[in-house]
Regions:
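Conserved pre-ATP/AMP-binding loop-to-beta segment of ANL
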Residues: 52-54, 170, 180-201, 207-208, ...
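ANL superfamily adenylate-forming
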Residues: 62-63, 148-193
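Conserved AMP-binding A3 loop
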Residues: 66-71, 197-221
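AMP-binding/adenylate-forming catalytic core of the ANL superfamily
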Residues: 126-127, 143-146, 289, 415, ...
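Conserved AMP-binding/adenylation subdomain of ANL enzymes
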Residues: 220-237, 244-287, 302-303
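Gly/Ser/Thr-rich phosphate-binding loop
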Residues: 259, 286-291, 300-359, 371, ...
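Conserved ANL (AMP-binding/adenylate-forming) active-site segment centered on the GW(Y/F)…HTG consensus within
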Residues: 334, 393-420, 437, 450, ...
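Conserved ATP/PPi-binding loop(s) of AMP-dependent carboxylate-activating enzymes
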Residues: 366, 378-410, 448, 542-544
Length: 564
């Protein structure tokens, strides 16, 4: 495996060397060609040998901390792997891993990789129906969960291993018994780079989750592109605001930082507290920070300049960031939040890497290792179209495929992988997010991008979140309607609606303007994505019945706005 690992290291060093030179990195980077490769054994353990630098730093609002070195995590994961093997975990077995941000989460990920087992990451928010689905379609053989979550599994049928973390549960093995296992680990055979490693249940906004299968190279090696986008360096302290169970956690709390030999920092808060988070960034000396738009929007409500940080790189992920938020952070800290784009199915494929010009509203250019094209429904390249990845050559940072309900792998077909997202490309190759392919709609024959309208909406102080959908209209076919979650201190009343409509008139061309707004709680998936499909259905039904919401306002309600 030494030669294979050397190829991975060579690719890593190339990207670290050219972290500020996008043109060279994109032109000359080649994915390492791997046959047999186990990232935990062939890279992490080798890098961790005698390495007492911090690898994992877990903090809480209460002041408690856990800090583990690379060497300690390597040894602890060896012990866990030996313990799991003794409990019957075999190569290819599926392990449902449902833990919060506690050290055993990272130990189990490494241990499962060493064993050749397949991890099904799961959020602690799952209910019984979610678990039944993961047992049935995921073919779960073993469960590692917090002792306080054991009751969720009480009525689930099947013969599966139960391991409880953080306490005792009747009928469950105690996780802490693993620390008494042998400190040396010997694999039972070679791991092929194409062997399965992770099975994600995606949080679809329209249907039941798809099953995304990743291999021992598609995420561990593929996230070299994520490392490059973030701008990570050896010795960095990287903080990514994310919950376990979602792909972004593996992206930026596991593979990308450890590919760069950086320390993963996490803050556990019972309830989100912006000031507490900012205090932790200062206290831990965080150098690179990634957060979803929702968190950034809450952070900019603070006087950010009052926190003197060691931050060098700021990135946003999950959904594109609105220009207003980027501008506020730049004014406070002198650092530009750089957007990026990827999916559960891929590593980071588009982004603004360090040292490159950032265009307002653009999510960046294709990252090294990805050939990104915009295609129409017929497969022709366009300046605006669906974001697609060319498969010749196939990028390493792309899933093996979707697993069918019967357990078979549904491989990708054709010459390109279609993401389902739409973007526009400018003359310099920068891509600007338009929306999900099924979210974009027409009004009076004009194409409307919900994201563009939502970006203008949240610039208003009263708007915490917004989702724009088509509202059936007898004249224009459809007009943009915004469902708005109000910021604290604002009431769902006429004056608020009038202020928002006035703001929209200054920020949008007449054909793009939101004509109807409704103050409401936004429906979301378990991962926090807005379920626009539900809002579209709700709006279509309301218009079909000529029904209007109690907190809904239309432009025509306000004669003081004038014509337009």
């Amino acid at each position: 495996m030494v030669e294979t690992a050397a190829r991975f290291i060579e690719a890593r060093e190339f990207l670290l060397r050219h972290r500020d030179d996008y043109d060279t990195a994109y032109r000359d980077f080649r994915w390492p060609q791997l046959d047999r490769f186990n990232w935990a054994l062939d890279y992490f353990d080798v890098m961790a040998r005698g390495n007492e630098r911090p690898a994992l730093w877990l903090a809480s609002d209460g002041g408690s901390e856990v800090k583990l070195s690379f060497a300690a995590l390597s040894e602890r994961s060896n012990r866990v792997a030996n313990h799991l093997r003794a409990l019957g975990v075999k190569r290819g077995d599926r392990i449902l891993l449902m833990l919060g941000n506690v050290a055993p989460l990272w130990e189990c990920m490494l241990a499962a990789m060493k064993l050749g087992a397949v991890v099904i990451p799961a959020t602690t928010l799952l209910n019984r129906n979610d678990l039944v689905d993961r047992f049935a379609r995921g073919r779960t053989r073993h469960v590692i969960a917090g002792a306080d979550a054991a009751a969720k599994f009480a009525e689930l049928p099947g013969d599966y291993t139960r391991i409880a973390v953080g306490g005792e549960a009747p009928g469950w093995h105690r996780y802490d018994e693993a620390y008494a296992a042998a400190a040396d680990f010997a694999p039972d055979g070679a791991t092929h780079a194409s062997d399965p490693l992770l099975l994600y249940f995606t949080s679809g906004t329209t249907a039941k989750p798809k099953l995304v299968l990743h291999s021992h190279q598609s995420y561990p090696v593929g996230h070299l592109s994520t490392m490059y986008w973030i701008g990570l360096k050896p010795g960095d302290v990287h903080f990514n605001v994310s919950s376990p169970g979602w792909a972004k956690h593996a992206w930026s709390c596991f593979f990308a930082p450890w590919n760069a030999s950086a320390c993963v920092f996490m803050l556990n808060q019972p309830r989100f507290d912006a000031r507490g988070l900012l205090d932790a960034i200062v206290r831990a000396g965080v150098t690179t920070f990634c957060a979803p738009p929702t968190v950034w929007r809450m952070l900019v409500q603070q006087d950010l300049a009052a926190w003197k940080t060691n931050l060098r790189e700021l990135v946003g992920a999950g959904e594109p960031l609105n220009p207003e938020v980027i501008a506020r952070v730049k004014a406070a800290w002198g650092i530009t939040i750089r957007d990026g784009y990827g999916q559960t199915e891929t590593s980071a494929q588009v982004g603004n890497p360090p040292g490159q010009p950032v265009k307002s509203g653009a999510m960046g250019r294709p990252l090294p290792g990805f050939r990104v094209v915009l295609l129409d429904a017929a497969g022709a390249e366009q300046e605006e179209g669906e974001i697609c990845l060319r498969l010749d050559p196939r990028p390493v940072g792309l899933m093996q495929g979707y697993q069918g309900d019967d357990g078979t792998l549904l491989p990708l077909a054709g010459s390109a992988y279609r993401t389902g997202d739409v973007a526009m490309r400018d003359r310099d190759g920068y891509l600007t997010y338009v929306g999900r392919a099924d979210d974009v709609f027409k009004s009076s024959d004009y194409r409307i991008s919900p994201f563009e309208l939502e970006s203008v909406l949240i610039e208003h102080a009263a708007v915490a979140e917004a989702a724009v959908v088509p509202s059936p209209d007898p004249i224009r076919l459809a007009v943009p309607k915004a469902f708005i979650a109000l910021a604290p201190g604002h009431e769902p009343k006429r004056d608020t609606a009038l202020a928002i409509f006035r703001h929209l008139r200054t920020g949008l061309a007449p054909f793009k303007r939101v004509r109807r707004i409704e103050f409401a709680e936004l429906p979301k998936t378990i991962s926090g994505k807005i379920r626009r499909v539900e809002l579209r259905r709700r709006e279509a039904a309301a218009r079909g019945e000529d029904r209007r919401g109690e907190t809904e306002f239309c432009e025509e309600d306000f004669p003081e706005l004038g014509a337009g």
